Curated annotation (Swiss-Prot):
InterPro entries: Glyco_trans_19. It comes from the Bacteria. Pathway: Glycolipid biosynthesis; lipid IV(A) biosynthesis; lipid IV(A) from (3R)-3-hydroxytetradecanoyl-[acyl-carrier-protein] and UDP-N-acetyl-alpha-D-glucosamine: step 5/6. It comes from Shigella flexneri serotype 5b (strain 8401). This is Lipid-A-disaccharide synthase. NCBIfam families: lpxB.
Length: 382
């Protein structure tokens, strides 16, 4: 940091989730250093906090091999331009927020020019393609990790890493208002309630919806009053789910929701969901769950050989044991899913024990992540 200019932080966020993280980080930094300058690739939230956008976030937000290949020349041009302009600007710290395929190479380019670099949000190196940890170690001065087992992984390879807690854990209350969520969704307080979350991607909804619906039909036989809520991320996924339901379970009454996944989890006695961030959110909502997941046979075969962890869901990875049932591939079928969910819907010892462990894990990762990230940036900038 020089006396002639304000603290200057360069940031690159690659998608909406990164824009949210970036905005929280900028807000926390401005509280400590009001005249700091922020520049880089930013979305509307980061810009609203005062970040100067050299490129809009949409430029980097591409998914899938075909889309990336179609935009590759443009992406490479942006990375080369940022390498040059950040090299001239010499920010006090560069923060690459997620988007590892784009940011880690950029971080390496900048580190070679003497710029201090942080990678915010660890890629899943602990799960697969573990050798990426060496590239990350060469490219960054510090990794900011959401989860404690991520820091333990980096420590093993002597890559500087700081566990800052998870922003989602900060945003969600330790004791959610179940009745309040039921009021919002129109669910009676005394009814049994099941949330079905078949995923946010088209392929997931296609592979999981039929089995999830058949599971709900089986559970209705035991609990005739069972309310079923199905939050879907957008109109496309809703249309897809409705088509599958018309074929598989046309007479099954369900509450279809546009978004409102968090409310559905808080309101429910149990959830059946695809793995991913939804499992972490469900844990933070204190909703007992079963994880069911299917993929194409070759993809599953490949994943089994690449993935180095014993579990796929974040609650189990955090607990270091099978806290929630994971039924994958052939095991992801209605009879087994229903059998795993029945004791959870009973609201007995099983679900109470799970709820208590969820609360303990929530406290472990509720560390005021924005403040922790800001502190790490300022320490590196010294």
């Amino acid at each position: 940091m020089t006396d002639q200019r304000p603290l200057t932080i360069a940031l690159v966020a690659g998608e909406t989730s990164g824009d949210i993280l970036g905005a929280g980080l900028i807000r926390a930094l401005k509280e400590r250093v009001p005249n700091a300058r922020f520049v880089g690739v930013a979305g509307p939230r980061m810009q609203a906090e005062g970040c100067e956008a050299w490129y809009e976030i949409e430029e980097l937000a591409v998914m899938g091999i075909v889309e990336v290949l179609g935009r590759l020349r443009r992406l490479l041009h942006i990375r080369a331009d940022l390498t040059k302009r950040f090299g001239e600007l010499k920010p006090d710290v560069f923060v690459g927020i997620d988007a590892p395929d784009f940011n880690i190479t950029l971080e390496g380019n900048l580190k070679k020019q003497g710029i201090k670099t942080i990678h915010y949000v660890s890629p899943s190196v602990w799960a697969w393609r573990q050798k990426r940890v060496f590239k990350i170690g060469r490219a960054t001065d510090l990794v900011l990790a959401f989860l404690p087992f991520e820091k333990a992984f980096y420590d093993k390879y002597n890559v500087p890493c700081r566990f800052i807690g998870h922003t989602m854990a900060d945003a969600m209350p330790l004791d959610p208002d179940k009745n309040g969520a039921r009021d919002v969704l129109g669910i009676p307080y005394d009814a049994h309630c099941l949330a079905l979350l078949p995923g946010s991607r088209g392929a997931e909804v296609e592979m999981l919806s039929a089995d999830f619906l058949k599971t709900a039909q089986l559970l209705r036989q035991t609990y005739p009053d069972l309310e079923i809520v199905v939050p879907l991320v957008n109109a496309k996924r809703r249309e897809q789910f409705e088509r599958i339901k018309a074929e598989v379970a046309p007479d099954l009454s369900v509450h279809l929701l546009d978004g409102m996944g968090r409310e559905a989890m808080v309101a429910s006695d149990a959830a059946l969901l695809a793995s991913g961030t939804a499992a972490l959110e469900c844990m933070l909502a204190k909703c007992p769950m079963v994880v069911g997941y299917r993929m194409k046979p070759f993809t599953f075969w490949l994943a089994k050989r690449l993935v180095k962890t014993d579990y796929v869901s974040l609650p189990n990875l955090l607990a270091g044991r099978e806290l929630v049932k994971e039924l994958l591939q052939e095991e992801c079928e209605p009879q087994k899913l229903a059998a795993a969910l029945l004791p959870l819907l009973a609201n007995g010892k099983t679900s109470h024990a799970m709820h208590d462990t969820f609360r303990e894990l929530h406290q472990q990762i509720r560390c005021n992540a924005d403040e922790q990230a800001a502190q790490a940036v300022l320490e590196l900038a010294q």
